Design a protein with these regions (language model features):
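Active-site-flanking beta-strand signature of metal-NTP-handling nucleotidyl enzymes
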Residues: 101-106, 183
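Phosphate/diphosphate-binding glycine-rich loops and adjacent basic-rich segments that engage nucleotide
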Residues: 194-208
Length: 208
């Protein structure tokens, strides 16, 4: 049995917040981050144990290089929509570049395709189940990093197609990989964010 209680585990999960304005340093070593991510990959569940999740790590200068590529692709897209949009979001994205590291979460498309072909009765569900697996991996890695003492925030730069293609090229992943999320991390430079207000439990929990 684990050495922590359910309440302790939930307290750890509740500590996780979206932390912005991160420093370009990390009190957690690259080796420790790799160890934490490897641990999550070794046990996090997926439907039928299909294991569609893949993760790439970028530390230090590689993180900066990655974000330089992202900014290069994002700027013309946002300016074409509205120059004011880039003026507003550009500094926010630069803050992500200023962090220390990146954790990229991918879905291996071939895994999802093979699972759908093997389990035809539920073939239409594997994309959704893959998203469930992604969420589990992301929250576990994110919480583990914050327990180690660094802050993190989850981004979805794949919302802009040219950006995802550029990130895939930079990471050298196979063509069937789909970027699902991008976790930035680094030392916190301000007070840890408070938990936001939630709806009353009476509105979100039903006893049948």
């Amino acid at each position: 049995m684990p050495s922590i209680t359910a309440d302790e585990w939930l307290e750890a999960a509740a500590h996780r917040r979206s932390v912005h304005g991160l420093a370009g340093t990390s009190k957690v070593s690259d080796e420790r981050v790799q160890e934490l991510v490897s641990n999550v990959l070794s046990f996090a569940p997926s439907s039928y144990n299909t294991q569609p999740v893949r993760i790439s790590l970028a530390f230090g200068e590689k993180h900066k290089e990655l974000w330089s590529i992202i900014l290069e692709k994002v700027e013309p897209v946002l300016k074409s929509i509205n120059p004011a949009l880039w003026k507003k979001l550009g500094p926010f994205l630069q803050n992500h570049k200023a962090a220390y590291g990146s954790i990229l979460f991918w879905e291996r498309g071939q895994t999802t395709k093979e699972a759908a072909e093997t389990h035809k009765a539920t073939s239409h569900m594997f994309s959704e189940w893959g998203d469930h697996a992604q969420g589990i991996h992301q929250i576990l890695v994110w919480t583990a990093l914050e327990l180690e003492g660094v802050g993190a925030n989850l981004q979805h730069m794949n919302a802009i197609p040219p950006v995802e293609a550029a990130i895939k090229k930079f990471a050298g992943v196979p063509e069937d990989y789909k970027l699902k999320a991008h976790l930035n991390y680094g030392d916190e430079q301000a007070a840890h964010p408070e938990k936001p207000k939630k709806l009353p439990i009476a509105e979100t929990l039903t006893i049948l």
